[in-house]
Swiss-Prot record:
Family: Belongs to the ATPase delta chain family.
Protein name: ATP synthase subunit delta
Keywords on record: ATP synthesis, Cell inner membrane, Cell membrane, CF(1), Hydrogen ion transport, Ion transport, Membrane, Transport
Membrane topology: Peripheral membrane protein
Molecular function in Gene Ontology: proton-transporting ATP synthase activity, rotational mechanism
Subunit structure: F-type ATPases have 2 components, F(1) - the catalytic core - and F(0) - the membrane proton channel. F(1) has five subunits: alpha(3), beta(3), gamma(1), delta(1), epsilon(1). F(0) has three main subunits: a(1), b(2) and c(10-14). The alpha and beta chains form an alternating ring which encloses part of the gamma chain. F(1) is attached to F(0) by a central stalk formed by the gamma and epsilon chains, while a peripheral stalk is formed by the delta and b chains.
InterPro entries hit by this protein: ATP_synth_OSCP/delta_N_sf, ATPase_OSCP/d_CS, ATPase_OSCP/dsu
Cellular localisation: Cell inner membrane
Species of provenance: Vibrio alginolyticus
Length: 177
């Protein structure tokens, strides 16, 4: 875990709690995403690591973000600038979305298959995972022909390897032990 992630967590939690209270989770997500992209900009990054005062940095950052960030978002940016934490904005955004997904009981699931899956197969996988994980599931599908057949499903810490390659590897391990 990076230092910036540790630094970002309290800011993300504060932004999340405020957005939840005001019923503005999506709006805050968009604001933080925009501000994070500004912070990632090479020229802005040079400015962040330079010797500009916190007040001037906040002023510049708010001006660059313009109307994309409302008054409350600007206040967050000013507080982060005063504490020299604007470089952590991308991590704040990531942590915010993690909290948002947890709140909405949603999880991203990576489904890797040997061939393209049909809509019916995807719906079946999605419904079974929703039941097992007790969350809304967002499937991100990809094809890896080296699997030979079957699928690999990754959802957070859960990994289900039902691929032909995985089965062959497990069989090989069992025979060698």
């Amino acid at each position: 875990m990076s230092d910036l992630t540790t630094i970002a967590r309290p800011y993300a939690k504060a932004a999340f709690d405020f957005a939840l209270e005001k019923d503005q989770l999506d709006q805050w997500g968009q604001m933080l995403s925009f501000a994070a992209e500004v912070a990632k900009n090479e020229q802005m990054n040079e400015l962040l690591t330079g010797s500009v005062s916190a007040d001037k940095m906040a002023e510049i950052f708010v001006a660059v973000c313009g109307e994309q960030v409302d008054t409350h978002g600007q206040n967050l940016l000013k507080v982060m600038a005063e504490n020299g934490r604007l470089a952590a904005l991308p991590d704040v955004c990531t942590e915010f979305y993690t909290l948002k997904k947890e709140h909405e009981k949603e999880i991203d699931v990576e489904v890797i298959s040997a061939t393209e899956l049909s809509d019916e197969q995807l719906a079946n996988i999605g419904s079974k995972l929703e039941k097992r994980l007790e969350r809304k599931v967002k499937l991100n599908c990809s094809v890896d022909e080296t699997l030979l057949g079957g699928v690999i499903i990754r959802a957070g810490d859960l990994v289900i390897d039902d691929s032909a390659r995985g089965r062959l590897n497990r069989l090989s391990d069992a025979l060698q032990s």
